[in-house]
């Protein structure tokens, strides 16, 4: 079967999960850019060894007019069918296109690499610019693992991370197979919903995830993973407390698997967040309040997001009787 993906990179990793279980394999995976995502063809060389090393892959190619049996990237144009995860969003679309009755959940490891022993004992940290959670206790994580932590990601991510949470060295890799091998060889992966996190999930490696309140769609019920959305975390030396005095006010519906909503400002996650912030129950700065209330649908805080989303969120909060205590919305636009 010929399957295309236009990315992002994390999408490709979860498509691999589906191909690892899909009948009538091995399959051909084809990259093509479609203008809706960040462009994935440029990563072909970096992905090649990782993808072709998987036993369920027959061939890995760039698009050049080949027959396409399933354009997996088209999941973005369809309504999500109550997914538990990003993988479920892909497969809900794939089942319809392929007229398949298979139940694919990504419960087992689907990435197979040789662990890099050079990273034995290491803790790998990653934090991309999207899908963040300001309740995640990064400062405490860095303190806990500083002597053996390394950061993976682009230069801008590393610089920002060190400025915010303290210095940790950054490691670069010539291809994504080597990155996956480093994660597999490490003791633990800690990160947000990034490409590195997708690799870690494909390996089913020990992990702590910084869960996005806006798009919590990378949750998998396994015993060696922690999902932190309110500051609570189990570290080797101690347990960190919830940063919200009344956790019941954030209604995440975090029963695994399933139950998450994708309804923007009408979701219980947003309503609970408004209440917690307005009641001053959360130990956050004014800047963090702004970031939470002005995040765009993609989880990024940009000027255009403030212009569009902040006034709408404030209006929603006022209608709900919640005071966000932001004196002048125009000052942020």
Q: Model regions: which residues?
A:
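Catalytic machinery of carbohydrate-active enzymes
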Residues: 1-333
């Amino acid at each position: 079967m010929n399957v295309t993906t236009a990315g992002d990179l994390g999408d490709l990793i979860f498509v691999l999960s589906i191909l690892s279980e899909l009948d009538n394999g091995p399959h051909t995976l084809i990259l093509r850019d479609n203008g809706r995502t960040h462009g994935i063809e440029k990563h072909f060389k970096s992905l090649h060894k990782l993808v072709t090393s998987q036993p369920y892959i027959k061939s890995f190619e760039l698009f050049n007019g080949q027959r396409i049996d399933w354009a997996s990237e088209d999941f973005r144009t369809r309504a999500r069918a109550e997914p538990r995860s990003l993988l479920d969003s892909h497969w809900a679309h794939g089942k319809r296109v392929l007229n398949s009755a298979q139940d694919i959940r990504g419960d087992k490891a689907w990435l197979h690499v040789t662990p890099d022993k050079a990273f034995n004992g290491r803790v790998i940290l990653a934090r991309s610019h999207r899908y963040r959670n300001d309740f995640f206790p990064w400062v405490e994580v860095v303190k806990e693992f500083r002597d053996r932590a390394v950061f993976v990601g682009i230069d801008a991510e590393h610089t920002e991370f060190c400025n915010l949470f303290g210095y940790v060295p950054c490691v670069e890799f010539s291809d994504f197979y080597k990155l996956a091998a480093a994660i597999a060889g490490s003791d633990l992966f800690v990160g947000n919903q990034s490409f590195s996190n997708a690799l870690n999930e494909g390996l089913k490696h020990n992990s702590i995830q910084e869960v996005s309140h806006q798009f919590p769609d990378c949750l998998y019920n396994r015993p060696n993973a922690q999902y932190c959305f309110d500051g609570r975390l189990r570290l080797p030396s101690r347990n960190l407390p919830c940063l919200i005095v009344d956790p019941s006010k954030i209604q995440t519906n975090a029963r695994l698997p399933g139950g998450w909503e994708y309804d923007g400002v009408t979701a219980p996650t947003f309503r609970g967040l408004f209440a917690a912030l307005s009641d001053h129950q959360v130990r956050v700065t004014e800047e963090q309040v702004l970031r939470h209330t002005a995040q765009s649908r993609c989880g990024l805080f940009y000027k255009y997001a403030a212009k569009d989303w902040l006034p709408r969120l404030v209006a929603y909060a006022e209608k709900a009787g919640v005071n966000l205590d932001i004196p002048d919305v125009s000052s942020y636009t």
